[in-house]
C-alpha cells in the first residue's frame, strides 16, 4: 500500500 507504509516510516522518523 503506497502511502500507508510511507506514512508509518515518516512517523517513525519523527520519533
Curated annotation (Swiss-Prot):
Activity modulation comment: Inhibited by PMSF, bovine aprotinin (APR), and soybean trypsin inhibitor (STI). Is not inhibited by EDTA, beta-mercaptoethanol, and high temperature (85 degrees Celsius).
Major site of localization recorded for this protein: secreted
E.C. number: 3.4.21.-
Similarity comment: Belongs to the peptidase S1 family. Snake venom subfamily.
Keyword Protease: yes
GO biological process: proteolysis
Protein name (database record): Alpha-fibrinogenase A2
Gene Ontology CC annotations of this record: extracellular space
Tissue: Expressed by the venom gland.
MF terms in GO: serine-type endopeptidase activity; toxin activity
Description of how the protein assembles with itself and partners: Monomer.
Taxonomic source organism: Crotalus atrox
Keyword flag Secreted: yes
Functional summary from the UniProt entry: Snake venom serine protease that cleaves fibrinogen Aalpha chain (FGA), partially cleaves Bbeta chain (FGB) and has no activity on gamma chain. Is more potent than A3 alpha-fibrinogenases and less potent than A1.
Localization annotation: Secreted
Keywords assigned by UniProt, alphabetized: Disulfide bond, Fibrinogenolytic toxin, Hemostasis impairing toxin, Hydrolase, Protease, Secreted, Serine protease, Toxin
Amino acid at each position: 500500500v503506497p502511502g500507508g507504509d510511507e506514512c508509518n516510516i515518516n512517523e517513525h522518523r519523527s520519533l
